[in-house]
Amino acid sequence: MDIPVEFLTAQEPLSYGHIPPVYWKELLNWIDRILTHNQATPNTWEATHMVLLKLHGTLSFSNPAQLPLVAAACLQIAAKHTEAHSRLADPDYITMLGDGVYTKPSLLLTETMALFIVGGHVGAYTLAACDWLLGSLPFSQAENDLLHPYMYHYIKLSYRHRTPDYHSSPALRAAVVIAAAVKGADLLEMNMLFIMMYHLTHISTASLSLGLTHFTAALQRQINLDFAEAEQREAAERRALLEREREQQLQEARERLDDVMAVLEAEVAITITTATEGTDAEDTSEVDVINVVDPIG
């Protein structure tokens, strides 16, 4: 059961964002025959892994024109044979993927990168594939902001130090695994991804451990930065809140003081008026008494 010859003899380059419908239809028919023949279960990883094994050694990974085709096929398989992803509609374009279609893009990204790793292509093809994948998967802007720096950092760093023989360079393979897992999976999910990739690519334990160490350190630095920024925001919000509360308390104190002053002024005015009236009455009495006493004197 061979792949259609059209895929191996294609002369025109296939862009990273669009795959001609004729290629899609032929490839999906071929994949359907494989999956039907092997009675695949509707499980994302099992279905994709099965086709990975079938594709291994069949496609020419030295041909950059086939990279997006293979990557798109892997994503299409994962969507096609998983019930939760049945909303994927038009198979002619991979770029029509929308928010909410994939519930675990990190897993799909890992599976697709596994295809490139198994194929053994290197260097610029890997980076081009990452560019294409990042442009195709439905990541939010916030997720892209997190994913881009780590992916390019690890892949380019490992590519710079690669050995001539790709298969003797586990660092590059580990880098792609790390980049694929950086999507933001929790620790349990991330460990599962690494375990699957370990069995698929035979990354050495030392390389995997080193990769996890670097990944954890980088992630911790990012977490620390995010935490520091969050603390600064919270401190600024607390200062603003305290300032507002202080102003409110001062305003309430001023209002209470004004009320007290008004009461005091009223009481003082009453006291002064009463005192003045009392003094006038006493003066008149004294004059009367004097007038009475004077004749006797």
Curated annotation (Swiss-Prot):
Indicate whether Transmembrane helix appears among the record's keywords.
no
The protein's UniProt keywords, in alphabetical order, are: Activator, Coiled coil, Cyclin, Host nucleus, Host-virus interaction, Modulation of host cell cycle by viral cyclin-like protein, Modulation of host cell cycle by virus, Oncogene, Repressor
From the UniProt entry, list the residue stretches annotated as the region Transcription activation domain.
21-113
Q: Name one GO biological process term.
A: symbiont-mediated perturbation of host cell cycle progression
Q: What is its main location?
A: host cell
Domain Cyclin N-terminal: start-end pairs: 21-113
Q: Name one GO cellular component term.
A: host cell nucleus
Q: Which domain of life is it from?
A: Viruses
According to the record, the segments passing through the membrane are none
Coiled-coil parts of chain: 222-270
Compartment list: Host nucleus
What does this chain do?
Answer: Transforming protein which induces the development of dermal sarcomas. Induces positive and negative regulation of transcription from host and viral promoters by interacting with various cellular factors involved in protein transcription regulation.
Domain comment in the entry: Contains two known functional domains, a cyclin box motif and a carboxy terminal transcription activation domain.
Describe, as the record does, how this protein assembles with itself and its partners.
Interacts (via transcription activation domain) with host TAF9 in vitro. Interacts with host CDK3 and CDK8.
Name the family the entry cites: Belongs to the cyclin family.
Q: What is this protein called?
A: Retroviral cyclin
Source species: Walleye dermal sarcoma virus
Coding gene? orfA
